[in-house]
Amino acid sequence: MISKAGSRTYERAHFPSRHPRLSTMERCLLKWAVIDRDDRVLDVGLGNGLMAEYLLRNMECEVCGVADDMELVRSTRGLVRSADLVYAAAGDIPWRDQAFHAVLLRPCRLDESAMENQLREVHRVLKEGGQLVMALENLPAPLRSALDAIRETPAEVTENITRRRAMKMLSQLGFEQFSWHPCGIFAGALVAWKRNTVEERFKKGEGE
């Protein structure tokens, strides 16, 4: 029986890299992600599959992914055969509580309620002390309004959540230690950490 680590080694040896060209945003997400060998990492959205492939080949971590596009899931499975990739709605991440050390979240056009549900699910599946790296547009309001007017998006989909609003949502859910890392002029990576209540209780006990 091949172990997870063995399957990653086999994949690197028998399925040569396509020398993927990661997008600027994907490179930004990977730059600020704190990932150790054998960590479990969740890629929410999957994109074109190149970031999941990069994680598997270069970070030696266990890669999982979820997207609400079945064709995207199928195509990404062809790139990263040892990753656990599933089809599910944005607000329904089908893994147990505290399953992941890190979650990488791509920019997506969800209304505020749907985004809050998605972030709540991210918080649920992250381990205490786990990291979220979230890609966000950071457009000035006039430019954002102009782009929204010309984009072909369904009527029920509103503008992207702003950085300030995302931080407020995350804080209410139990994230802390926020940092913002620009990626180009109008986008960036928002980093947040799930509050570690066990560590807090331990420190509180030491102080008493």
Where are the model-predicted features located?
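Core SAM-dependent methyltransferase catalytic element
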Residues: 173-208
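A short acidic, Gly/Pro-enriched loop at the edge of an enzyme's catalytic core
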Residues: 91-103
